[in-house]
């Protein structure tokens, strides 16, 4: 993610979790010309043109365009981690794990599993943060087995985090991943707010 975007976010002191989530999700949906119809979670985060927040969305989107940001799911994951307050970061130990490191860890975990085992294996992250590891795992299972994301979320993923916003952001990221792959539905997530 471009450092200018981080500077923009700091300068505008975006601290309201709900607004930040709506802003990031709406910008992502707008950027990729997506429009969820059936996924109630994503629909809840879309900023409408008549909304008072629409001007902030346009300003944020202009920054993304100005600095040529791809605004991938990976960028969105990094942004979600960036806006965690320093006090929350200290309490929860939240830290962004880069994609390359996540991929290496996941590769180590699944090494030796055949396709049938991968279809039925359950992956847990008991301090899942914004769900970066689950993005990596879901993509890998989908690519190697063809399993629908809805089924992966229901059968293969179990996550816990102490912060409610982290679980919400994990759900949002996974829902966007599915939407980008043609799955626009409500999902049964095994993601829970708890102190592990």
Predicted regions, residues:
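SAM-dependent methyltransferase catalytic region
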Residues: 37-44, 49-50, 55-62, 66-67, ...
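Non-catalytic nucleic-acid substrate-recognition regions in nucleic-acid-modifying enzymes
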Residues: 1-72
